[in-house]
Amino acid sequence: MDSSIEQKYKQLLDIVPSVSRETMENLIQFESLILQWNAHINLISAATIPDLWTRHILDSAQIFPLCSHSLQWCDLGSGGGFPAIVIAIFLKEKRSGHINLVESNGKKVAFLRTVIAQLNLPATVYHARIEDIYQKIPISDIITARGLAPLNELLQLIFPLLTEKTIALLQKGRDYATEVKNASANWHFDLLKHTSKIDENSVILEISHIRSY
């Protein structure tokens, strides 16, 4: 590895210990594909390109250790592949597990499928609106979403996919407390808050036992 990649590898190990160099190489390949495709379709904001590794890849990577034992994952509104593709890369290293991605934008679906094929990832992309795939998605241990919708709306989208044991890992920004308060008016749920290792003003909400009033 050259010095810049070695530095990125050290940063990754701070987030997810014991990551293989093969996994690191897959993440670097993913980073390269994002940059190539972003010139043609809007996968990430141009303003965040200089911080792609930290703001998007490491930010996604921090989710995996929270439930690394889980085998069946589902990511809603997958967009440019955060956190879904990053999780898929870690699942590939485990040699077990699978993640289903749901995305309605055809160009982004094409990108996601290209990445999955090139990196040989254990993932499937559903080209559909979330509301249209409830009967198609296999039962999931973990559901993820990043920047998709306010928590109250997000729980409404997630609810039909839940089992008694399903856990939602939802990345939220500085207004998360207001979102939790608003959602609590309509939903019962157990909540664990994990402060982001990337941005101290952001959190990962670990939500379980979701039920409506």
Curated annotation (Swiss-Prot):
InterPro entries: rRNA_ssu_MeTfrase_G, SAM-dependent_MTases_sf
NCBIfam families for the chain: rsmG_gidB
Name of the protein in its database record: Ribosomal RNA small subunit methyltransferase G
Location of this chain's protein in the cell: Cytoplasm
Family to which the UniProt record says this protein belongs: Belongs to the methyltransferase superfamily. RNA methyltransferase RsmG family.
Keywords for the protein's UniProt record, in alphabetical order: Cytoplasm, Methyltransferase, rRNA processing, S-adenosyl-L-methionine, Transferase
SUPFAM superfamilies cross-referenced by the UniProt entry: S-adenosyl-L-methionine-dependent methyltransferases
Domain of life: Bacteria
GO molecular function: rRNA (guanine-N7-)-methyltransferase activity
Annotated S-adenosyl-L-methionine binding sites: 77, 82, 130-131, 146
Species annotation: Bartonella tribocorum (strain CIP 105476 / IBS 506)
UniProt cross-references to Gene3D superfamilies, sorted A to Z: Vaccinia Virus protein VP39
